[in-house]
């Protein structure tokens, strides 16, 4: 386990270390803990949160939504919910889920062979892998096959440097500037208030609520605060995250995945701010088709992989030395490993959210649907007794539309292929993207926004290249110029 994790999780009076199912506690254990029983027990605790109470709540929600869909003439909630999305109908969603499975399965099969070989080093008779083992085995393969240890980059990702780096990158890419307002009111003393400006003129405000505290939401999200209305009010939003808080002795070193999350959520934030100059609140910000909102945020994640971008902020917290280019190259290759399986995992969630809402609620056995779709769409086995749907919050908000994340990942990679990956901080593509994709908000259909920027509807080809990048030649050009 990382030294700073152990420092924050010391044994209590009874000699035991207490670990919660909150994300900052859970994910490092699943990734680094050698004790398989600890990982198994924590995984089962994580996947039974809010059970059985939320099982009944979810069934009630499913029944209400099905009744609404029936009242307005739709066969299912999934069909009703798709009507105002880019997908348009339930049949297109089912087709997309199969399309993703077809793309990811061959890559995932190659990855599973490596993961199983790694597991057999300690368990020679192993023939299968459980879901709770994936993160740990993936980390071991990254070390053995890609010469990369996730902990080797953490010293270069001190929270304060990452925050300033992302602010600087967003300012340069989207032609903005950011100014902190030290005395502005906020809901907690730890929350920072920032103004966004263009050409010296304020265009919006945002709040950074970035560290855990008691009773706080324990995931990461961009939260709209005010809709922007041209000439009446400026848009406001907050980033609510749970990154380790820096202290006098600890600069808040971040995992690679945490930095990616920061980029992702800041992508949502920029989208909200620059699209908040509409005539009507109803089309301001990200008030658009629900299966488009994750595309801009996922695209900004790609800046995290650029050696040029990282050189601007990723410095060792002790020596101040920039992250070595060779380490960045190994990091990117290692980060690409297990994409196939991760996409299949996300696709299984897409299938679960779709399947439970695409039929009559009384016909749905939640645990059975989850186990069936996990086995059908992934190579990992579930643990007996898992009831993860009870704490799968997207079944409430996204309901049948969890496919949105992969739908938008396809769009994001198609968008990113239009940028010069060798120089992401220059050129006019970023401003064309801002004007044609981000700024219109909900004033145009998302399908039109995509066509305006790409010159055509999205396709899956760039996504496939991204998906198989781990097995591509290191010298191959990821993004040939269009």
Please name every model-derived segment.
Residues 42-45, 146-148, 388-391:
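Short, charged/polar, low-complexity loop and linker segments
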Residues 16-18, 161, 165-178, 185-188, ...:
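C-terminal, non-catalytic "cap/extension" segments appended to globular domains
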Residues 1-21, 34, 59, 64, ...:
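Active-site-proximal, well-structured secondary-structure segments within enzyme catalytic domains
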Residues 32-46:
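Short, charge-rich amphipathic alpha-helices with coiled-coil/heptad character
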Residues 13-15, 23, 36-37, 48-52:
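Substrate/cofactor-recognition hotspot
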Residues 244-263:
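Short pre-active-site segment immediately N-terminal to the catalytic Zn-binding motif
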Residues 51-64, 441:
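Short, 15-30-residue, compositionally biased linear elements
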Residues 23, 46, 243-245:
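Short, histidine-centered active-site or binding-site loop motifs used for metal coordination
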